[in-house]
Amino acid sequence: MARRITLNSLKPLSAMSNHPSLTPTTTPTAATASTSTAPSIDSSTAPSLPSTFNQMIFEFNGVKYTGAPHAWMMPYRGFEQHMVNMVIETRPDATFSRFDDLLSAIVTALAVNGITATTSLTDGELVLLRFADLATRHASLPSPSPAISDWSQSVPGPLLDTLEYGAPLIPAEPTATPAPTPLAPADYPPPPPHVADPAVSHSLVALDVPDAALPSMPRASTSTASIPSLMSLPIASPPRSRSSTLSSSTSTSTPRLPGTVVPRRPSHIADDETYNRSRAAYAMGVPAMSPMYCTGKERHFEQTFYSAYPHAANGVWTAYQHSIILIAAPTEDISLLTLHNVEREQSATEAYHLRALDGATVARVAVFRLAPTMTCHDVHAMMAGHNVVSISGLAAAFMIRHKLTDGVFSKSFRRIVMGIDPVMMRHDPVPLHLFAILTDHRLDHAATHAVMSMRLALMQIESASYQATKAWLRGHLPVTIFASATTDSSSDSIHATILEADKGMRVADTPGSSTLRELEASNTALQRQVIDMDVQINALLRTISDLKSYTNHQQASHGYSIQQYLHSHTCVNTQELPLIQSVMGDQAANAIQAMRTHANEAARSALTDKVTAPLTAQLSDTMAHLHEARAHNGDLTAQLAIAETDAMTAANERDRACELAVELESQLATMQREYDQTTRALLQDNEQLQHSAATAEAAAVSAFRPTPPLTYGTAPSALPAVGPGLTVPLLAAAIDPASLLL
């Protein structure tokens, strides 16, 4: 069956603090997580829980835990089960009795997987989505050891009603085997003492484990050797019944001192002594005095401190990267908290810049003022999302007077600094006394067991000399002490050396009787001068009174005539309103000003008409000429358009004629070439014909020529016979004589 742990059952503040049988310092060794055995709390006296808009519900091994996580975790709402699966993967056998313990384990698991306050929301969601199905993947993992379950059920249920988160008055006794301290990863080097790298992620250690103000629970172990020690732990007796408790409302019993505090679990950042020394170092404004300095366990605190608070490196002031979050009293003067010059920022919120003597801006302070109507929830809302917060001494006293200290000074995931300037904090130890009291005790417990310490601290802070002393320190500390706010561990010796070097000797002894008589005589003379000046002041005051009465009489006697003149006189001067108001008053001056304004407008209109009347006729003639010129211009424009059209037509025809001439010339050239070719062909044909004719004639002549005889006279001499139709003249005519020469 799922067991549900709520803030109402784990933080019974006002209702349980007034319970006579429930002492705020009783620290139970163990308590069951079930709320069924816890007695009900009257709703009229129960503390009001914060709204659920800033809460998340985690279900781990069947137990539901409800509470407010860190501000940077709120955008991951809806991934609660993914975060739990992430813890189950790394610590499947772990158990948690409080919401803060589970939240510390979740923050550690997120940091191991690369999800911190500086991680983007998209990257963080992508990492968380990988753990969506771990519930089924790890279903086969072994269940928690019986020793753990026996320990968790070994204490009666009513003990839950005695849970009160107040720090013990007496610190825990040292044990022989303290709880092991988790070491930082090998690839997580410490930051430089004077450089704050904003890109460095938060430390991988648990950030939200409660501190000495919360009860230390026994460490659960799966080994059988731890069972006897767990069973031998002292068990607190159950409280009395609620009916008997409520009946004794006037009980005068005081809270009991706690017993031996069990060492912290291994998931805590360090043992009690180291952890408290670290808180004291930050409260004094010197993180270098912390035993865990530069070990990687408090890297996120160191980064925040050195990126916001004034400090120097190698004689040069380091520029700030974040603002100092300061909780101050309602009427507190912020300039008395530092030796630097304070300048108000021009913004809607109250913020200041701290400037050194060389003009460098060394810090920015964002101030949150307390108010009498505030509650503890309002104070926690101011501090939400900040792991290093400054509280002034007056603010601490105000919170004590108005009971606003619960959970403010006792969160392990936050460091409180009692001021804003490390140099001034060294010279103002009274706020550190209040810090020590409120860190060791709850306020109701400190009112009975540390009443004298708290009374003396409040008397010093609330006295008139406290602010005057701080103002004197601010004005008389040597200028060279500013540069001693370095991050090295030898700053104490630097302070001492500077103060010793600045020590001055008295230039004169205590004044004697003669000197006192001279001072008395000088004082008497000064008193006489003061009396004479008082007489002169009284005479001047009487003269001023007489002048006022005379002025009033003159205004009363001449005011009516002046008013009549001003009302009857028509004036257009509207620049004398201040003068008229001083003489006549606002009401009469406004009426006169309205009349003058109307007259001014009428005069302007008349003058305008008078000046423009002679020019009206000229303007009309000019307009008529202008219209005629425009009409003539239009005609000329039309004619010009026609001429341009004709010119364009002629140009087009000319272009066509040119094209036709070029074409005809081309055709003529072609025909000439063809004629030449034809002529040459005819000549060639004629030559060939003539040659053929000549050849034919030669052949014909050869055919008809008689063959000469071999011997002259032997051949017959008769001519060949002529064919029919062929006569000798025709044959002679057919023979070209020229061909016979060939």
Swiss-Prot record:
Role noted for this protein: Non-structural protein with ssRNA-binding activity. Is probably involved in the formation of viral inclusions, where the assembly of cores and the replication of viral RNA are thought to occur.
Protein's organism: Aquareovirus C (isolate Golden shiner/USA/GSRV/1977) (AQRV-C)
Name of this protein: Non-structural protein 1
Biased composition annotated in UniProt, kind: Low complexity: 20-46, 238-258
Gene symbol of the encoding locus: S4
Keyword annotations from UniProtKB, A to Z: Coiled coil, RNA-binding
Residue ranges, annotated region (Disordered): 14-46, 230-268
Protein family: Belongs to the aquareoviridae NS1 protein family.
Coiled-coil boundaries: 635-700
MF (Gene Ontology): RNA binding
Signal peptide per UniProt: none
